[in-house]
Amino acid sequence: MLLKDKVAVITGGAGLNGLGFATARMMAANGARVFILDLAVAKPEVAAAQLGPQHVGLVANVTDKASCEAAVAQIKQLAGRIDILVNNAGITQPRKTLDITGDDYDAVLDVSLRGTMYASQAVLPLMIAQNGGSIVCISSVSAQRGGGILGGPHYSAAKAGVLGLARAMAREYGGNNIRVNCVTPGLIATDINKGKIPDDKRQAILDGIPLGRIGEPADVAGCVVFLASDLSKYCTGVTLDVNGGMLIH
């Protein structure tokens, strides 16, 4: 198994139809002990229970640094180490540039970008002490092509920020044997976009995807598992596109 005896932490992983939970499920199937962090309303303990008794769901808010640190302290007490962090938590909003309010901007940037920084800051001291670890950050094709299917420009900005932050951390912590990489999903079938794309627009999107289908959460999860595992042990600062060819660059 690719992740045998590894301890993995996944933020925003409680949504059963989302990228985070698909990643949690695949990591568990590959031997990792998984800790799912999410807001109380998302019931991370219920999601973790579906993976098996050794997996744990903890309430944490990635926009609150103290909350991230408390969760990591609890994981350290329970598992003794953290080998993998998946910065998956994020939100989107369908806004045009002139319609984005300050509150909109703060909400999206806080979860996707600030949350990635705070969760990484909480985990990094433990990884440094262990002399090793893998951090995988979920960005988006929206960061690369200047807009997505549903997310507004502030979402593109947040996810572009995640790319820059991950690359900078990769450069900073390579000497500690800590790898930091990004995955940039295209359109993936999750609850975020379920029922929100009209049939005519959906067909136009499909016409622009060489592989001819919308992605599934497991498509992204497989790439995250690869970057988290030793199969990619000489990869850091990488951006791995998972978009079916929607953007080839």
Sequence positions of predicted segments:
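Canonical Rossmann dinucleotide-binding motif of NAD(H)/NADP(H)-dependent dehydrogenases/reductases
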Residues: 3-35
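Active-site helix of classical SDR
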Residues: 120, 158, 166
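Alpha-helical segment proximal to the catalytic Tyr-Lys
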Residues: 125, 167, 171-175, 233
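Residue(s) in the substrate-gating loop at a strand-loop-helix junction
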Residues: 140
